[in-house]
């Protein structure tokens, strides 16, 4: 059976996009990925909707695909101690909390008292309220005060601080611990940096990749997620 003209057009669309140099993360592909990813609890959807409705820079939220990825990674790692740097409105902490083992807990760091209070309201309504500890203040101070070891770390905060956060947590990472870092593609602009944020993120990626203490993979999931563990 031969395909109709319309069918051929649909079949060739992805390759045509690639030949034209269009970015992979188109709206259509994003929608397809969303539709084929297991959704998280309704409370997280409510959190996301309220974040977009009431806060500035709502795009900083991790979102359902990265949230499900974090849930899966935490479920596989079965961490006793999770460290999150950058609570924002609590979406990613809630996503990770759902994958914790019975003895697992999360310490999440947020500089803004207002955002921390917003997130706490959702934590209190969740089944994991007693397992999420919000620390308000500079994240480096919190990391310094914690003994570790960290079994899972999620970094999604001020991009200028990424290298400092990385250096602070690597010595406190458990032997099988994993670090996940969000936004490491920075909209694709790390490939050919133009502004300061581009250069900061590109420098962070170079720093991690050159670090002989660790090994990493940069995944092209949404805005880029880098997974890191100790080498050897």
How would you label these PLM feature ranges?
Residues 1-152, 159-180, 184-232:
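A short alpha-helical cap/connector motif
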């Amino acid at each position: 059976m031969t395909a109709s003209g319309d069918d051929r057009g649909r079949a060739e669309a992805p390759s045509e996009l690639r030949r034209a140099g269009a970015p992979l993360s188109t709206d259509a592909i994003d929608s397809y990925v969303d539709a084929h990813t297991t959704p998280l609890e309704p409370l997280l959807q409510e959190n996301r909707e309220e974040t977009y409705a009431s806060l500035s820079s709502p795009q900083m939220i991790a979102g359902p695909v990265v949230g499900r990825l974090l849930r899966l990674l935490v479920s596989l790692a079965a961490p006793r101690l999770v460290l999150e740097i950058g609570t924002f409105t609590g979406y990613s902490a809630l996503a990770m909390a759902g994958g914790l083992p019975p003895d697992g807990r999360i310490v999440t760091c947020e500089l803004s008292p207002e955002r921390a209070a917003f997130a706490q309201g959702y934590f209190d309504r969740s089944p994991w309220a007693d397992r999420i500890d919000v620390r308000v203040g500079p994240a480096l101070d919190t990391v310094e005060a914690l003994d570790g070891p960290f079994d899972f770390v999620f970094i999604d905060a001020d991009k200028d601080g990424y290298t400092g956060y990385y250096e602070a947590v690597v010595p406190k990472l458990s032997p099988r611990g994993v670090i996940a870092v969000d936004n490491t593609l920075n909209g694709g602009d790390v490939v050919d940096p133009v502004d300061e944020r581009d250069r900061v993120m590109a420098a962070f990626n170079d720093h991690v990749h050159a670090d002989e203490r660790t090994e990493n993979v940069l995944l092209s999931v949404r805005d880029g997620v880098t997974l890191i563990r100790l080498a050897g």
